[in-house]
Amino acid sequence: MDMLIYLTPICALIGLIFAGISYKNVRNEGEGNELIKKITAAIHGGAMVYLNRQYRAIAVFVVFIAIVLALVLPNGVLTAACFVFGAVLSATAGYAGMLTATIANGRTTNAATRGIGPAFKVSFASGTVMGMSVVGLGLFGLSLSFIILGNIYTDMDLFTLLNIIAGFSFGASSIALFARVGGGIFTKAADVGADLVGKVEAGIPEDDPRNPAVIADNVGDNVGDIAGMGADLYESYVGSIIATMLLAASTAAATFPGIPVMNVVMVPLVIAAVGILASVIGTFFVRTNKTESSAIHMAFNMGLIAAIVLTVIASYVVTGHLLGGYGLNVFFSTVAGLVAGFLIGQITEHYTSYDKKPTLTVAHSCQTGSATNVITGFAKGMESTLWPAVIISIAIYIAFQLAGLYGIAIAAVGMLATLGISLSVDAYGPVADNAGGIAEMSHQKKEVRQITDTLDAVGNTTAAMGKGFAIGSAALTALSLFASYAIAVGLTSIDVMNPNVFIGLIIGAMLPFLFSSMTILAVGNAAGEVVVEVRRQFKEIKGLMEGKADPDYSKCITISTHSALKEMIPPGILAVIAPILVGLVLGAGALGGLLAGSVVSGFMLAITMSNAGGSWDNAKKFIELGNFGGKGSDAHKAGVTGDTVGDPFKDTAGPAINILIKLMSIVALVFAPLFI
């Protein structure tokens, strides 16, 4: 085994050390006054209670699947061990990110009393813990599994060895599914419940401490957008690397004649390793003391561009060193993925930002009522699929022409190589959002709230861009895993003239819609319970509306937690059982059709829902700035309705589809021996 392979866990450890330093920096910040401490403790306590209960529930699933893997697969015990290892590290990353975010929010509010610079520093440092934990633990676990098993089982076929290690990605996918679905149900149940009764019925502002669901809403921001987003991208990161390694083992001899197969296998690991170093360096470019949101955007872009440029340079050196004359083709495939990821983020921003035409059109439609708002927003969401589809298609075409199926997979690795910093930027948003809520609830000065509002506005944009990036990376990762599955079962093409294959295609195209239905209905049911509870408290607690009595915040947290844990099980079972049943009943070709159908329909549906939801959200915010009558106007009420409809679209169903298409692909790959 080439000594260069040992670089990967070392770079991963550097990322983890940097995450530890960032955590220490957050802890060293002042906690604020007693009221800030009290609110922070309530949010932190609610988030950690939910996360602990969720992980206990997932542990049962993980143990059950591990036993099944050990019993039914060749090399099942090794696959089960990798599965558990991947699940544990994914859960650890989520725990680290959640722990940090829920102690950073109050500290960000307190830092905002000293100016935007200190507040920005604290919130971004918190995001950095999540970003670096995900890439550090993901690459460390994957490379360690490869090194240990490779050194022990020296006589094992390389493709077989890597198929065992694919269990690591399956473990990551399992955690991701429940974290995304459960977290999405929790956050939107609380959010919708708080908005419907608080804003629409009671007429009180957002983050008002009189609202019984306000703490649950803030807890949900962390549960969904920190732990959920982190697990989603951890899964894509790990899945893209293992898919590329599998394709290298199976196609290297034909695609790169004369190059040692191990060199081709190592390329994704080494690119991921240098991507971590580039991300760490990129964080030092994220600095600003200016109060304009454009300056904060510029600071983030400087960091992202620095990381991308460094990764491009390093990838050129790595591919040239490992692949010789073929290095340039693989290098340009990597760059195609990097550029595609960046462009999809920009397209998402265009469709969801309130200073761009699509969202302004949605905001304008609010003047004629809720119905026209919903119609226009949904239409714009569907329209927004055009350019991401074109961009992904061009990236796939370029990568395939340059390096075959391996090129497509390495494009996914390229897209995710700078995940360390891009996820840090995404994870900053919920902290800034919480800080604004805490500022409101702790009655801070207007200047402090303006600072947190500025940080939050930037966070909304970065979150929308992050969702677009997550969808694009999920599509490429799922396609790479699908290609690995096809090789594992000996499929050379998907013959749609074969009835079984066409049946699989139809079932696959249907599954994202059924899955979305289940998650959206779950949000509706859970939100209904929260609404009933909030109404009860406003009615029964005397003096609550006047601010003379405190609401029972814990009740709404308990309802949201119970609903999320109960409702996340059926979608999770569907995602695992569907590909296994189709493979066993209709055969490997039909399962190939299912995977192809789910990737195509899932990609389009996820973009539609995420961008429609983001557009409705920011159309409402545009009206709240004083446009079309401002807060309390009929246009604002229509905007709130659109935002409420969009909440489960953009924060529950849309993001969860990413995991569905990846999880079904990895399930098919891991269980491939059963379908041959």
From Swiss-Prot:
A GO molecular function assigned to this protein is: inorganic diphosphate phosphatase activity
Per UniProt, activity regulation is:
Requires K(+) for maximal activity. Inhibited by the Na(+) ionophore monensin, activated by the K(+) ionophore valinomycin and unaffected by the protonophore CCCP.
Q: Which Pfam families match?
A: H_PPase
Highest rank taxon of the organism: Archaea
Q: Name one process (GO BP) from the record.
A: sodium ion transport
Task: List the InterPro entries.
Answer: PPase-energised_H-pump
The entry sums up its family as follows:
Belongs to the H(+)-translocating pyrophosphatase (TC 3.A.10) family. K(+)-stimulated subfamily.
The protein's name = K(+)-stimulated pyrophosphate-energized sodium pump
Q: What is the lineage of its organism?
A: Archaea, Methanobacteriati, Methanobacteriota, Stenosarchaea group, Methanomicrobia
